[in-house]
Amino acid sequence: MKFVVVFASCVLAVSAGVTEMSAASMSSSNKELEEKLYNSILTGDYDSAVRQSLEYENQGKGSIIQNVVNNLIIDGSRNTMEYCYKLWVGNGQHIVRKYFPYNFRLIMAGNFVKLIYRNYNLALKLGPTLDPANERLAYGDGKEKNSDLISWKSHYLVGEQHSVLQDPPTLSYNQYLKLSSTTDCNTQDRIIFGTNTADTTREQWFLQPTKYENDVLFFIYNREVQRVALKLGRIVDASGDRSGIWTRWMK
C-alpha cells in the first residue's frame, strides 16, 4: 500500500517545492514508526507492538501497519503469527481483518481450513484405517478437495520462545496431527499421524508465513523439533495419494 498524504486547501495553495518537502518529511517520519513497530515484533515485545498498532490505526496511519505486515511476510518472520494472535486477542481484530491476508483471519477465527501442499496441490487428510494405538496415517489426498476429510481447525496457545502453537484437529475424525517419535536413520524424516489426544509437544505446531511468487504460504513446524517442517512423500499409491506426510529437516 502506498503512503498517501491529504492536504488541506490552504496547504495546496503554497509552492510545489514546499508541498514535496512536507510529504517527504511525513514519509520519513512514518518510516521511523514502521521500523519501531517491526523491531518490537522481531524482538518479541508484542504488548508494545499491539499498543503501537492500535495507536497508528486510531491516527489514520494504517499504511504503517500494512507495510510492516508485508515486510514480516516477505522476510518469513516466525513472529508474524504471534503478532497477529496478540492483536486478535488484544482488541485488534479489526486490524487483523484490515491489514493481514485473508487466510490469517480464517485461522485466527478458528474456522476449518484446508492444508494444501503447494508442490503437488494435494490436501492433507487422515487415512481411514486405525493402527493398534488408534492412530491414523496422514496423507496428501490425490482426489478430494471439498469434504470433511480435508478440513482442519486451529487452536492457539501462547507458547515458549515467542511462538504461536497450534493443535489442528480434523473435522472428519476429530483427531490431532502428531509427529512420530521415530526418525528414519537414512533421511532423518518422521511420519505424521492422527491421534486422539494432544497432551505433548509432538501434537503442537506453529505456522511460519512466507511470500512465494504472488502467494502467501505457510511452513508448518512441530514444536518438539522446531527445525522440522511438513512435506509430502514421493511415493504415489493407486488412489493418487502421496504415501503419508513426512517431515523434512530445514536448515
From Swiss-Prot:
Localization of this protein: Secreted
GO cellular component: extracellular region
Note: This lipoprotein belongs to the group of structurally related '30 kDa proteins' that comprise major protein components of the fifth (and last) instar larvae and of pupae.
Superkingdom assignment: Eukaryota
Pfam families (alphabetical): Lipoprotein_11
Family: Belongs to the 30 kDa lipoprotein family.
Signal peptide (residue range): 1-16
Keyword Ribonucleoprotein: no
Broad class of the protein's primary localization: secreted
Keywords: Lipoprotein, Secreted, Signal
Annotated protein name in UniProt: Low molecular mass lipoprotein PBMHPC-21
Keyword Oxidoreductase: no
